[in-house]
A protein has these predicted regions:
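Short, small-residue-biased leader/transition segments that mark boundaries at the very start
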Residues: 1-4
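Short acidic, glycine/serine/threonine-rich loops at helix termini
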Residues: 25-29, 98-99, 124-127, 157-162, ...
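Short Gly/Thr/Asp-enriched flexible loops that form oxyanion-binding sites at enzyme active sites
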Residues: 88-110, 246-254, 283
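C-terminal non-catalytic interaction/assembly regions of soluble proteins
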Residues: 241-338
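Short acidic/histidine-rich motifs immediately flanking catalytic phosphotransfer sites
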Residues: 79-84, 229-233
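Internal gly/pro-rich beta-alpha loop/helix module
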Residues: 114-183
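ATP/NTP phosphate-donor binding region
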Residues: 8-77, 253, 257, 273
């Protein structure tokens, strides 16, 4: 590994370990998270001041809203005595966690950098050693905010998406520039630091949110059934710019029924890049008129977690619409909201 710069060794950091592939060890039933932060740090160069918390040892497929709240609380506690935080985390739900922490820890004044690996750090060829090393560097040199450091890239947390199952460059920055990269033992910034307001922490959420991906022929009855399941908000991955069926199987009318029952519907696209908008085509006119909320250029992960976070504040439909359109942490380009 490359030597760590003087700037890194001067900073006091804190690692919060949550499990994931990076911490996995063999077991009779397959790989399972077993290493804590202290063991993980043995695989990266020394010379830095790092405290650590072993929060839990979980496969990230099991990370749920309760764990997001625990992580946020751990960050708030560690923030009192450090200048940067690294969270080791499984890759499968890392983008959801990074998005939710971006909302919960809005305008945090220190960097919170999530990282993990595609292969366990105990393997000689693991990407975990490089990723953890790079995350430590990033957490030492970034400004406040929530980020993912993976491979050489550093990505804004609420703009990251896992796009590959096994490749080492597993994450991409969607509809937003990469924040920077780690090279030669230092962080290289690609963007100017954003102006920050006073740190605002809000961890109360309503997890009763459903994500529905439309396919040609999706039953309207299925869409309408979410109301009977106690769901309080729906994110719909529609076709292209936001198209839905409006004849034979009328998705638009079914979603309107949900809205009429005070269940907010957020419309996003199955396309990974560029913004969705229900304002372009005739097929979505029913939704436009009924108050569907456009996700604009948000990622699906950001739209889902933001809706949970907004519903933690309010269930008033007008306020939900206003908050979903507001840019809290760089998750949405307000100019793209139709």
């Amino acid at each position: 590994a490359l030597p760590i710069s003087e700037a890194v060794t001067m900073k006091k950091l804190h690692i919060i370990a949550t499990g994931g592939t990076i911490a996995c060890v063999p077991s009779p039933n397959g790989l399972m998270p077993g290493l804590g932060a202290k063991e993980l740090l043995e695989y990266v160069p020394g010379g830095h001041k790092i405290e650590y918390t072993d929060l839990f040892h979980m496969d990230s497929s099991n990370i749920q809203p309760e764990e997001w709240q625990q992580m946020a609380k751990a960050v708030i506690k560690a923030r009192e005595s450090c200048s940067g935080i690294v969270i080791t985390h499984g890759t499968d739900t890392m983008a959801y966690t990074a998005s939710m922490l971006s909302f919960m820890l809005r305008d945090i004044d220190i960097p919170v950098v999530l990282t993990g690996s595609q292969y366990p750090i105990v393997r000689p060829d693991s990407d975990g050693r490089k990723n953890l090393h790079n995350a430590i560097i990033a957490a030492s040199e970034l400004t406040g905010g929530v980020y993912i450091a993976f491979g050489d890239a550093v990505i804004k947390g609420c703009r990251a998406v896992k796009t590959r199952t096994t490749s080492l460059n597993a994450f991409e920055s969607i509809n937003y520039p990469y924040i920077g990269a780690v090279a030669n033992g230092g962080f290289i910034s690609f963007v100017r630091p954003e102006p920050r307001k006073e740190f605002s922490c809000f961890i109360d959420i309503d997890p009763r949110v459903a994500l529905i991906k439309l396919i040609p022929g999706t039953s309207p009855a299925f869409l309408e059934s979410v109301a009977s399941c106690g769901i309080k908000g729906v994110v719909v991955e529609a076709f292209g710019l936001g198209g839905v069926h409006n004849f034979r199987r009328d998705h638009a009318m079914s979603l309107k029924k949900l809205i009429d029952e005070d269940i907010p519907v957020v419309l996003t696209s199955q396309c990974l890049y560029e913004a969705s908008s229900p304002d372009i085509y005739e097929v979505s006119h029913t939704l436009r008129d009924s108050g569907v909320i456009s996700a604009a250029d948000m990622t699906t992960e950001a739209a889902v977690t933001k809706l949970m976070w907004v519903l933690g504040h309010t269930h008033d439909m007008d306020k939900v619409r206003q908050m979903m359109a507001w840019d809290y942490c760089g998750e949405i380009n307000a100019d793209r909201v139709m």
